[in-house]
Amino acid sequence: MAGNGAIVESDPLNWGAAAAELAGSHLDEVKRMVAQARQPVVKIEGSTLRVGQVAAVASAKDASGVAVELDEEARPRVKASSEWILDCIAHGGDIYGVTTGFGGTSHRRTKDGPALQVELLRHLNAGIFGTGSDGHTLPSEVTRAAMLVRINTLLQGYSGIRFEILEAITKLLNTGVSPCLPLRGTITASGDLVPLSYIAGLITGRPNAQAVTVDGRKVDAAEAFKIAGIEGGFFKLNPKEGLAIVNGTSVGSALAATVMYDANVLAVLSEVLSAVFCEVMNGKPEYTDHLTHKLKHHPGSIEAAAIMEHILDGSSFMKQAKKVNELDPLLKPKQDRYALRTSPQWLGPQIEVIRAATKSIEREVNSVNDNPVIDVHRGKALHGGNFQGTPIGVSMDNARLAIANIGKLMFAQFSELVNEFYNNGLTSNLAGSRNPSLDYGFKGTEIAMASYCSELQYLGNPITNHVQSADEHNQDVNSLGLVSARKTAEAIDILKLMSSTYIVALCQAVDLRHLEENIKASVKNTVTQVAKKVLTMNPSGELSSARFSEKELISAIDREAVFTYAEDAASASLPLMQKLRAVLVDHALSSGERGAGALRVLQDHQVRGGAPRGAAPGGGGRPRGVAEGTAPVANRIADSRSFPLYRFVREELGCVFLTGERLKSPGEECNKVFVGISQGKLVDPMLECLKEWDGKPLPINIK
């Protein structure tokens, strides 16, 4: 990215630079964002600010979290621009917003430049704050991001403002003092006039100006300056300085930057969760084969498939699923449903949109976006429209639709996961108790997910087609950039709710598969022992043909879904005993013996260990071995690349296996994950799942 107005002769239209920004994988880009967000110092000079850095400063309370430094090399150019304005006025120059009125009244003239700046701030202080605690104030995190982005823009030296003002705003940032800005009231063209006027109002000491300190106290401008250590009193703005602060897109682009940081992380998370979904559903991993996606050409889908392929290639679940799917293949669907099988094709375009939106916002936070632009080298004040925040509005609309589509896929996968008719042998509603009549598992959670998804789909509608003309029809088209960014922030919150809920459900499914394997192993072991003990001889003391039925009995167990007989494996009314009876009866009929006696003996010995969710002390409804980690069959998740995510939920966050016998509700556990995601704690375990990926799909092997 060429900074400070430099033109690259080989790329005069900037298309080459825009294309180059998309080189490499999306995952690598997310890793870079995360690294940038963890830098202790953000040094800005006007053209190199990154989304991750904006997110970091937004979430930090003050310099102890992230310190902001100004590049001293910017001082001369900022000073030159400021001095040019004063010199131009002294020689009778006529400049918009310096000697003229504003917007639709720019035909008016004045020679009192400082007074004009005072009136600019007064009439733009049009925001409504309510009581100050009822949701009408912009969150301080967004204000911090806006201050950072505005400073970055003004450092480029095209705006006619003193460097000392930028230093003062930086001191406010570093001491955790955030001006109070109204949540609403901007159309982001001509910039974010109304909210930015409150930043200018604070540094000029307007009596209505307020700020919030790092400990949440509200203070006036004088106290804010004292806390920040700004000496010399309030600023009296020179001509153009008020306009330089307010006439820009920095609030919309700042919020958009923080939103896009989260959107990129959640996009990668959706890829990982789709792979985990395949694991717990005993899915068929061939949907990730590189040839399929290479033939469709879309890079987002190719990468999404490669990421899922990587996780599934190292999955113990997939080895087991292969065995399961090989049993009676002609009686099973040949392919999985769309929510799994087309997940790369669904997520790929969303990732492409999110990447493009991220780069557009990154260009905007490094742009000169006020009016007029002061060209010191040519001695001109260029009157244009860089304040038009259309890149923000359009990018946010596009990103929000992509976020809604990610949520739609997540809901479709979740709905399959909790539905016993679709989840390939898992329990109804992922219930974890012995008695399914007293455990409805994730039923309420599915209702909540439907609510989240519905609201998210509504938010997917565009904002930018609702533009209203303003300022005496001077601002007859405007971007609504901040409005769209706010709605995208809402969409991100809802996707976090959905992701949290889905993660808890997937971990429940992982443990149910573990339970399933141990129950089946226990039943097989018991049937084998009982068969060898009691089926060798018939009641008359002769060798029984039933002694040859052991293999068929084990095969019948393999073919029967464990949770159909989990209440009591020895119950004659449940499917397992009916299938075992059929095996013995077939042997009896073929040999002329009576099979009922053998079945009765088998039942009398009770298939112990097959009561899968018995209330063992401390087991939370699971057999003691599974609950205590001493089960004969280990949990396959420990031998899968998705394990770091599971470990994070179960160990770091302490989320438990849910059963009707416990008081712990699904919402309590989902909330733990939601807080973890919101605090950024999920990023490391998510990336750990992919640490071995080399950025390439598996090779296409031709036999």
From Swiss-Prot:
Pathway given in the UniProt record: Phenylpropanoid metabolism; trans-cinnamate biosynthesis; trans-cinnamate from L-phenylalanine: step 1/1
Subcellular location as annotated: Cytoplasm
GO terms for cellular component: cytoplasm
Listed GO biological process terms: cinnamic acid biosynthetic process; L-phenylalanine catabolic process; phenylpropanoid biosynthetic process; protein arginylation; response to cycloheximide; response to gibberellin
Predominant location: cytoplasm
Family, as annotated: Belongs to the PAL/histidase family.
Annotated thermal dependence: Optimum temperature is 55-60 degrees Celsius.
Catalysis: reaction(s): L-phenylalanine = (E)-cinnamate + NH4(+); L-tyrosine = (E)-4-coumarate + NH4(+)
Annotated function: Catalyzes the non-oxidative deamination of L-phenylalanine and L-tyrosine to form trans-cinnamic acid and p-coumaric acid respectively with similar efficiencies. Facilitates the commitment step in phenylpropanoid pathways that produce lignins, coumarins and flavonoids.
pH dependence: Optimum pH is 8.0-8.5.
Protein name: Phenylalanine/tyrosine ammonia-lyase
5-imidazolinone (Ala-Gly) crosslink, residue number(s): A189-G191
Known EC number: 4.3.1.25
Top-level taxon of origin: Eukaryota
Residues at the active site: Y96
GO molecular function, one term: tyrosine ammonia-lyase activity
UniProt organism field: Zea mays
Positions with a binding annotation for (E)-cinnamate: N247, Q335, R341, N371, K443, D471, N474
Pfam families assigned to the protein according to its UniProt record, in alphabetical order: Lyase_aromatic
Residue numbers carrying 2,3-didehydroalanine (Ser): S190
Region: Disordered, residue numbers: 608-627
Cited InterPro entries: Aromatic_Lyase, Fumarase/histidase_N, L-Aspartase-like, Phe/His_NH3-lyase_AS, Phe_NH3-lyase, Phe_NH3-lyase_shielding_dom_sf
The keyword Cytoplasm appears for this protein: yes
UniProt keyword terms in alphabetical order: Cytoplasm, Lyase, Phenylpropanoid metabolism
Signal peptide extent: none
